[in-house]
Design a protein with these regions (language model features):
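C-terminal binding/interaction regions
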Residues: 1-42, 54, 150-201
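Glycine-rich phosphate/diphosphate-binding loop of Rossmann-like nucleotide-binding domains
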Residues: 6-13, 34-85
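Short, ordered loop/turn segments at secondary-structure junctions
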Residues: 24-27, 49-52, 85, 108-110
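Short beta-strand segments
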Residues: 47-49, 106-108, 151, 165-167
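Short amphipathic alpha-helical segments
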Residues: 58-60, 116-120, 177-178
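N-terminal small/polar loop signature for handling phosphorylated ligands or for N-terminal nucleophile
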Residues: 67-107, 111-129
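Conserved acidic residues
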Residues: 102, 147, 161
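Short, acidic/small-residue loops that bind anionic groups at enzyme active sites
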Residues: 123-148, 187-197
Length: 201
């Protein structure tokens, strides 16, 4: 029943999906089994890449959903900024933010359009790539929409800042965050040498 609910929830409103005579006594494993909240606050920046949003022609919902998820996970402070799809502006801003923020997440510009410049701009700057993060995000998204395969998102470190590039749709951004959040929390615990279950003290 839980699998059915998980597969159907993107296609209807929650109140429209009713599964009767199903009782859950105990649940173990799955993403909810892993920690999704930081032990100590970590600074983060969320950059929304969109010509139309930057011009005020439509509101940003994807970036706001990422900010909300980070806030709930204990990231603080969080810098939020909207900018157009301009490579030079993005590169300069990210390099500036690496001086102050431990985690930098871009939203938008990971597709195959001519103005999707985020990946092409930031990938050459990555000093240590974390391919598994975006592999997890795409695998998670692919179970919900075939369009997840079109994302070219990358992740990795620039100096000591973790940079992650997410899709610009609200669904793509929020699902990617759901997929990578446990790993994201674990990464910053490890980076700060905090002991973790199963690791060496």
């Amino acid at each position: 029943a839980l699998t059915i609910y998980d597969m159907l929830k993107p296609h209807c409103e929650p109140h429209e999906l009713i599964i009767q005579q199903c009782k859950l006594d105990l649940k173990k494993g799955g993403k909810s089994h892993f920690k999704r909240h930081l032990r100590q606050p970590v600074s983060a920046a969320v950059l929304v890449l969109s010509d139309t949003v930057a011009a005020g022609r439509k509101p940003d919902t994807a970036g706001r959903s990422v900010v909300e998820t980070l806030t709930e996970a204990g990231f603080d402070p969080i810098h939020y900024q909207i900018l157009p799809d301009e490579a030079d502006q993005l590169k300069a801003l990210v390099l500036e933010l690496t001086q102050s923020y431990a985690c930098i997440i871009t939203v938008g510009g990971t597709g195959i359009g001519k103005r999707d410049i985020t990946v092409d701009t930031l990938e050459p700057l990555l000093e240590r790539e974390l391919n598994g993060l975006m592999e997890a995000a795409r695998a998670f998204g692919q179970k919900r929409t075939p369009y997840a395969a079109m994302s070219r998102g990358v992740a990795g470190f620039i100096d000591r800042s973790l940079v992650i590039t997410l899709p610009g749709s609200r669904g793509g951004a929020s699902e990617s965050m759901a997929a990578i959040l446990p790993a994201l929390v674990h990464i910053f615990d490890v980076c700060r040498d905090l002991p973790h279950p199963g690791g060496y003290e």
